[in-house]
Amino acid sequence: MNTETKSLPAWLDKVRWDDNGLVPVIAQEASTNDVLMFAWMNREALAKTIETQRAVYYSRSRKRLWFKGEESGHVQHVHEVRLDCDEDVVLLKVEQVSGIACHTGRHSCFFQKFEGTVDGGDWVAVEPVLKDPEHIYK
């Protein structure tokens, strides 16, 4: 994670970063308001997102910036960036290129819906796979 924040813009200080220097981010399709995905950003990722108008996240597993679509081509063009009332969650209103945001090949990462009751329910996939992930990631 980039700990050199001196050269980053002062407006980043308004965001309430967690103890790891991260903030949760929701990506939402600008045209439909569909919630596409949840991810994390550090200061550098948020600044890069504003600068490029493309979604850049911070990968906690890879411990580096993750340019959405860098492998798949499924980039997110950012139309608007919002900060919630507590200043601890970022919302990106995006155009999802190719319509696929999820690594499973679906439009949204939120493709599983709970059906049933507390005693007899389960999660059911309610969105189709638009493209086989094996053909997305080579």
UniProtKB/Swiss-Prot annotation:
The keyword Cytoplasm applies. Pathway: Amino-acid biosynthesis; L-histidine biosynthesis; L-histidine from 5-phospho-alpha-D-ribose 1-diphosphate: step 3/9. Mg(2+) binds at residues 84, 86, 88. Homodimer. It catalyses: 1-(5-phospho-beta-D-ribosyl)-5'-AMP + H2O = 1-(5-phospho-beta-D-ribosyl)-5-[(5-phospho-beta-D-ribosylamino)methylideneamino]imidazole-4-carboxamide. One of its GO terms (cellular component) is cytoplasm. This is Phosphoribosyl-AMP cyclohydrolase. Binds 1 Mg(2+) ion per subunit. Binds 1 zinc ion per subunit. Its cofactor is Mg(2+); Zn(2+). Keywords: Amino-acid biosynthesis, Cytoplasm, Histidine biosynthesis, Hydrolase, Magnesium, Metal-binding, Zinc. Its main location: cytoplasm. InterPro entries: PRA-CH, PRib_AMP_CycHydrolase_dom, PRib_AMP_CycHydrolase_sf. Its EC number is 3.5.4.19. Zn(2+) binds at residues 85, 102, 109. It is found in: Cytoplasm. Belongs to the PRA-CH family.
